[in-house]
């Protein structure tokens, strides 16, 4: 059984990681441990590189705390231009897989508050009245009328980031 450390306590991220690992390695093939670790970047990262650095830092910090695991996984959400997206970073002892998620264009009224220094989650919670929306459907769920959620978009990116771990060509 694979021991997988999720460098997050966010239920949407954990759900995406668990589902993707089960789809790739088989149902019941993984035990998931969830831990809170620092990203080393601002609460609301801006740009692809800062966001990717946050995910990489979370993986490194998770590895330091739980070095006996088989996989360490982090998902870091960020703002790039007028959109929100995330980076997924997965490592085992010998390699790394990374993938960027789909992007969601954000309305100007939301972007204005984020650019003033607020994190997207709290801005969206105020806008929607949904407490801790970032731990639930997120802006993605709201602006896609529930057709997608944070977890569903993260899930795709986790599947992509897992590609090097089950394909010999890598």
From Swiss-Prot:
Picking any one GO biological process from the record gives:
nucleotide metabolic process
Needs which cofactor? Mg(2+); Mn(2+)
Please give the Gene Ontology molecular function terms for this protein: ITPase activity; metal ion binding; nucleotide binding; ribonucleoside triphosphate phosphatase activity
Question: Binding of substrate: at which residues?
Answer: 8-13, 68-69
Reply yes or no: does the keyword Cell membrane apply.
Answer: no
InterPro entries documented for this protein? ITPase-like_fam, Non_canon_purine_NTPase, NTPase/PRRC1, YjjX_NTPase
Does this entry carry the keyword Manganese? yes
Cofactor binding note: Binds 1 divalent metal cation per subunit; can use either Mg(2+) or Mn(2+).
List residues binding Mg(2+).
38, 68
Q: What is its EC number?
A: 3.6.1.73
Provide the assembly information. Homodimer.
Spell out the family assignment given in the record's similarity comment: Belongs to the YjjX NTPase family.
Q: What does this protein do?
A: Phosphatase that hydrolyzes non-canonical purine nucleotides such as XTP and ITP to their respective diphosphate derivatives. Probably excludes non-canonical purines from DNA/RNA precursor pool, thus preventing their incorporation into DNA/RNA and avoiding chromosomal lesions.
Q: What is this protein called in UniProt? A: Inosine/xanthosine triphosphatase
């Amino acid at each position: 059984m694979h021991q997988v450390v999720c460098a997050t306590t966010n239920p949407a991220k954990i759900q995406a990681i668990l589902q993707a690992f089960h789809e790739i390695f088989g149902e019941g093939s993984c035990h998931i441990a969830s831990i809170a670790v620092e990203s080393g970047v601002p609460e609301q990262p801006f740009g692809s590189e800062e966001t990717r650095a946050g995910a990489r830092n979370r993986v490194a910090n998770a590895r330091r705390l739980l070095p006996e695991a088989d996989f360490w996984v982090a998902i870091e959400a960020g703002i790039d231009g007028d959109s929100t997206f995330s980076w997924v970073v997965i490592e085992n002892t010998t390699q790394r897989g990374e993938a960027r998620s789909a992007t969601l264009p954000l309305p100007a009224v939301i972007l204005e508050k984020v650019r003033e220094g607020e994190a997207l989650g709290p801005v969206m919670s105020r806008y929607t009245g949904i407490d801790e929306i970032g731990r639930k459907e997120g802006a993605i769920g709201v602006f896609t009328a529930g057709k997608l959620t944070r977890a569903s978009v993260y899930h795709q990116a986790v599947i992509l980031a897992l590609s090097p771990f089950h394909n010999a060509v890598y």
